[in-house]
Amino acid sequence: MDKHTAAIPTLTIKVVLLGESAVGKSSIVLRFVSDDFKESKEPTIGAAFLTKRITRDGKVIKFEIWDTAGQERFAPLAPMYYRNAQAALVVFDVTNEGSFYKAQNWVEELHEKVGHDIVIALVGNKMDLLNNDDENENRAMKAPAVQNLCERENLLYFEASAKTGENIYQIFQTLGEKVPCPEQNTRQSSTHDRTITDNQRIDLESTTVESTRETGGCNC
């Protein structure tokens, strides 16, 4: 980072990704952080921590991104990752009805445990599976159900594709606009009050930190 960039005000935003396994959370992060996509990707075991900086309106926005495991056995440990988050992406697969209802549960839990100040974006991922489907026969959830949830819970809503990159950057850009900007934000990311560094994977069962070589994982 050069001296000019270092002088630009920086807003740090902690973002947590939640959703059922295999809805594409890690692929969304990988697309945003590295502009990459892997057709075959192993499920997240634990949680991955990644960062990405963008410049917007004369300030640097640093996203501290927690990509959490979607398996049910890890769900009780998720609060340690969404605690103190300013924003959340709650992801579902547009072709999987069950994943939408799981996303709805996550939204309700966030509002119950974190409060209503957190900015939540509901993301319908895998739109690439529908782009050639004129009749939307493969779409699991119709617009009214999604819109009702967004209006009731005051959510942002995006339909996206980690595979093609559709709307991925726009999701994070919008979070950067919606999260309030304090005069100074010096919060550090931590797990059990332990500071960690970029691009590391967390073992949710033992809460130990392990290095990883992986670099990535429209309003209603």
UniProtKB/Swiss-Prot annotation:
Keyword Magnesium in annotation: no
Gene3D superfamilies for this protein: P-loop containing nucleotide triphosphate hydrolases (3.40.50.300)
Gene Ontology cellular component annotations, sorted alphabetically: cytosol; early endosome; endocytic vesicle; endomembrane system; late endosome; plasma membrane
KW Transcription (keyword) present: no
GO annotation terms (biological process): endocytosis; Golgi to endosome transport; protein targeting to vacuole
Chain sites annotated for binding GTP: 19-26, 67-71, 125-128
Cell location: Cell membrane
Membrane topology category: Lipid-anchor
GO MF term (any one): GTP binding
Disulfide-bond pairs as recorded: none
Cysteine methyl ester modifications at: C220
Record keywords, A-Z: Cell membrane, GTP-binding, Lipoprotein, Membrane, Methylation, Nucleotide-binding, Prenylation, Protein transport, Transport
InterPro entries: P-loop_NTPase (IPR027417), Small_GTP-bd (IPR005225), Small_GTPase (IPR001806)
Lipidation (S-geranylgeranyl cysteine): C218, C220
Other comment: Present with 830 molecules/cell in log phase SD medium.
Record function comment: Required for transport in the endocytic pathway and for correct sorting of the vacuolar hydrolases suggesting a possible intersection of the endocytic with the vacuolar sorting pathway. May be involved in recruiting the MON1-CCZ1 complex to membranes enriched in phosphatidylinositol 3-phosphate (PtdIns[3]P) or other charged lipids, leading to recruitment of YPT7.
Family: Belongs to the small GTPase superfamily. Rab family.
Protein name listed in UniProt: GTP-binding protein YPT53
Organism: Saccharomyces cerevisiae (strain ATCC 204508 / S288c)
Gene: YPT53
